[in-house]
Curated annotation (Swiss-Prot):
Free-text function comment from the UniProt entry: Catalyzes the oxidation of 5,10-methylenetetrahydrofolate to 5,10-methenyltetrahydrofolate and then the hydrolysis of 5,10-methenyltetrahydrofolate to 10-formyltetrahydrofolate.
Pfam families: THF_DHG_CYH, THF_DHG_CYH_C
Gene Ontology CC terms, in alphabetical order: cytosol
Residues the entry annotates as binding NADP(+): 166-168, 191, 232
Subunit structure: Homodimer.
Pathway(s) this gene product operates in, as recorded in its UniProt entry: One-carbon metabolism; tetrahydrofolate interconversion
Organism in which the protein naturally occurs: Orientia tsutsugamushi (strain Boryong)
PROSITE patterns, A to Z: THF_DHG_CYH_2
Protein name: Bifunctional protein FolD
Catalytic activity, as annotated: (6R)-5,10-methylene-5,6,7,8-tetrahydrofolate + NADP(+) = (6R)-5,10-methenyltetrahydrofolate + NADPH; (6R)-5,10-methenyltetrahydrofolate + H2O = (6R)-10-formyltetrahydrofolate + H(+)
GO biological process: L-histidine biosynthetic process; methionine biosynthetic process; purine nucleotide biosynthetic process; tetrahydrofolate interconversion
């Protein structure tokens, strides 16, 4: 029987752990950890995601703030906001909600955020630490969530052949690096891959992060160990006449062909939020440690 990998349940466990660590940090050092989320523009879906993050932060006793900015804000003004947050000692985590307006250079933006406060793990310094296998820096939240789901439900990742579909800087690349750190054999597939099914059907684990509704079907699977679905798409349901959330994989066609599978929603999404807050706690500890050490080279500004 196929096991549904319940991301909501596991995320709640991780949130409880983070809540307890926050309380301990506050009791010992009187630190109130704070996350700031910058939202550029009026994307309704982005606002829903941001509000969910704020609600989860509040539930575990973490301060948070949303900074809403005009869609057509000049890049230099956005960077100025980030510079101020970098220097603010009461702020421990900074993220800019994606997607961004096209006139904003995402790579320049990621590099602008202080790497110690980059709780999305997208600053080039953090990406560099991840790729060289250094035990420091902050790791992208979705990648951490996927690995946690696999380690929680699947016995042993070492030596497993994992096919990652998608090569984005947000999910595909950092996830592949983290899988390599866990001694997996990794194949990265993308839009130019010839005969995708040839790769997926022979994999132990398939992880898809494309954002294309239900494009993976039964033809792509054949008794695989696990399928992790990172993709999120909204489609119109002809039966209910409402929009619904689906993943990259056609769940009903795939679920009996794998031993473990994540649902959409309720799989990777909650884990991403849980690790965003866990990363913010980690960032606070790193920043406070540098203050205690009185390390001038590590001062915020």
């Amino acid at each position: 029987m196929t096991v549904i990998m319940d991301g909501k349940k596991l995320a709640e466990l991780r949130l409880i752990e983070t809540k307890n660590d926050l309380l301990a940090l506050k009791d010992k050092y009187q630190i109130t950890v704070k996350l700031v989320i910058i939202l550029v523009g009026n994307n309704d879906a982005s606002l829903i995601y941001v509000n969910n993050k704020v609600a989860k932060a509040k539930a575990i006793g973490m301060d948070s703030e949303i900074i809403r900015l005009f869609e057509f804000i000049e890049e230099k003004k956005l960077f100025s906001v980030i510079d101020d947050l970098n220097c603010d000692s009461t702020v421990h985590g900074i993220i800019v909600q994606l997607p961004l307006p096209p006139h904003i250079d995402a790579l320049k933006l990621f590099a602008r955020i202080d790497s110690r406060k980059d709780v999305d793990g997208l600053n080039p310094i953090n990406i560099g630490y991840l790729n060289i296998g250094a035990n420091q820096g902050l790791i992208p939240c979705t990648a951490l969530g996927c690995i946690d789901l696999l380690q929680y439900y699947v016995t042993g990742l070492k030596g497993k052949h994992v096919v990652v579909i998608g090569k984005s800087n947000i999910v595909g690349k950092p996830l592949s690096a983290l899988l390599l750190r866990n001694s997996c054999t990794v194949t990265i597939c993308h839009s130019a891959t010839v005969d995708l099914a040839l790769h997926t059907r022979t994999a132990d684990i398939v992880i898809s992060a494309v954002g294309k509704a239900n494009f993976l079907t039964d033809k792509h699977f054949s008794g695989n160990l696990a399928f992790i679905d990172v993709g999120i798409s909204h489609i119109y349901d002809l039966q209910t006449h409402k929009r619904k959330l689906v993943g990259d994989g056609d769940f009903l066609k795939i679920k009996d062909l794998v031993k473990f599978i994540t649902p959409v929603p309720g799989g990777v999404g909650p884990m991403t939020v849980a690790y965003l807050l866990k990363n913010t706690l980690t960032a606070a500890k790193l920043i406070y440690a540098s203050i205690i050490d009185n390390d001038n080279e590590k001062r915020l500004c």
